[in-house]
Amino acid sequence: NQNNFIEFKGKSEKILAEDISSPLKIYELFLETISKENGSSISCEQTPKNLYYLEEILDFFPDAKVINLVRDQRDVLLSQKNKWKRRFLGAKSIPMIEAIRSFVNYHPILTAKVWNSSLYQTSKFRSNSRVKIVKFEDLLVDSRIQVHEICKFLEIDFQENMLKVPVIGSSTENDSKSELVIDSSKISKWKKGGLTSSEIYLSQNLSSNMMDEFGYEKETFTFPPIMVVLH
């Protein structure tokens, strides 16, 4: 319980009293402890930056499998642009300062470069049998098929409730925890507004090669939008 510092400190010291040879060993102990406390036999970790350390992770954890979810860069851009709104759409625990930071830090060029970099890293593991790349759009359109494939990859049984997902976490809509569904309306939300033509142009221009490699069709521009110069 990280909210209780004394309790958390005591548990940490007890765990770390074991022989620790590397930061990855600490991470392994952390995963084992959290999984045990929650009665789980499988640890599931979703830190995006882990993508940049896949080689080390796969080497240190021989039984680990990785699912890399890829989404249209323009929808990612729209999400990042509106990320600051999460505090007002159901995530009330997000501090106001964090909402302000998200608003100030947004920039289409930076977001596009991060997306492009992550997809470049992803492409290196396309032939790795322990890494499965899933397009977000495919998951929403063919939910049952895609979830079955994911279960097969993970060697776990498919369960019907895997298709019942609370509609939360959006940066453009209010949370709806009572609505349990894989929401296909999330596909190509950027086409419904929210991004300027300049943002779309920059996004596509900076991510062109990776968009082509992962099958994302680009919007055509005869000339660059005039407002591009402001970015």
List where the protein language model places each region.
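Soluble or luminal CAZymes and related metallo-dependent hydrolases
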Residues: 19-26, 46-49, 107-118, 142, ...
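Short glycine-/polar-rich loops that comprise or flank the Walker A/P-loop
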Residues: 61-65, 99, 127-131
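Conserved phosphate-donor/acceptor-positioning beta-strand/loop module used by diverse small-molecule
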Residues: 46-49, 56-82
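Extended hydrophobic/aromatic segments used for targeting, binding, or gating
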Residues: 73-121
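A structural motif corresponding to the C-terminal end of an alpha-helix
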Residues: 34-37, 118-131, 199, 206, ...
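The conserved 3'-phosphoadenosine-5'-phosphosulfate
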Residues: 68, 73, 124-197, 201
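PAPS-dependent sulfation machinery
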Residues: 1-45, 50, 87-104
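Membrane-proximal basic amphipathic "stem/tether" segments
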Residues: 217-231
